């Protein structure tokens, strides 16, 4: 992703970047990707499409959807997000993957293009996220921000000690 952000590489979908990283990881462990059946390699790469939501996410999204437009703004490509929604029952109104703006967070065009497509001025939009860099970039583009505490995926017990770096809304 960083090579795209820095302009050293043109935009490519996250699924392709994930596959490249998977292949590099396999090589790092002395395994040649060509030794893995292509269907198995592809299935492993698409694991991102089958992520389980945080336990409070689906209910929270349904509650937000009653009054607001709910749309993920993600570095994932649109198909990845469609698959996640179908797999997890996520009630999104629309999906804004990185392929929509052909850019990755925290590039300003990601946030501004999303507002443009939704017909919303940045100061009337809010990014809800668990990453300070993402919230910081959104705020610099004029969006309101809300920090959601999410524990380390490997140790959910740390949720109580996770704190935002800045004073988000």
Q: Where do the model's predicted regions map?
A:
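Asp-based, Mg2+/Mn2+-dependent phosphohydrolase catalytic module
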Residues: 33, 58, 62, 73-169
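Pocket-edge positions in alpha/beta enzyme catalytic cores
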Residues: 10, 14, 49, 102-103, ...
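Surface-exposed cleft-lining segments at the edges of enzyme active sites
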Residues: 42-50
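Solvent-exposed, charged/polar functional surfaces in cytosolic regulatory/catalytic domains
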Residues: 21-24, 28, 63, 67, ...
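Glycine-centered short loops/turns at secondary-structure junctions
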Residues: 67-68, 142
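A metal-dependent, Asp-based hydrolase signature
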Residues: 1-42
């Amino acid at each position: 992703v960083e090579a795209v952000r820095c302009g050293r590489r043109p935009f490519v979908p996250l699924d392709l970047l994930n596959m490249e990283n998977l292949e590099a990881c396999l090589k790092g462990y002395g395994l040649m990707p060509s030794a893995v059946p292509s269907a198995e390699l592809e299935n492993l790469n698409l694991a991102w499409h089958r992520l389980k939501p945080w336990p409070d996410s689906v209910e929270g999204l349904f509650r937000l959807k009653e009054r607001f437009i709910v749309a993920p703004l993600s570095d994932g490509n649109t198909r990845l997000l469609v698959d996640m929604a179908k797999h997890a029952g996520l009630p999104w109104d629309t999906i804004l993957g990185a392929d929509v703006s052909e850019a990755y967070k925290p590039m300003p065009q990601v946030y501004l293009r999303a507002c443009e497509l939704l017909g919303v001025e940045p100061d009337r939009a809010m990014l809800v996220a668990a990453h300070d860099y993402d919230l910081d970039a959104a705020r610099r583009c004029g969006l309101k921000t809300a920090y959601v505490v999410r524990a380390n995926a490997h140790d959910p017990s740390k949720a109580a000690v996770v704190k935002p770096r800045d004073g988000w809304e």
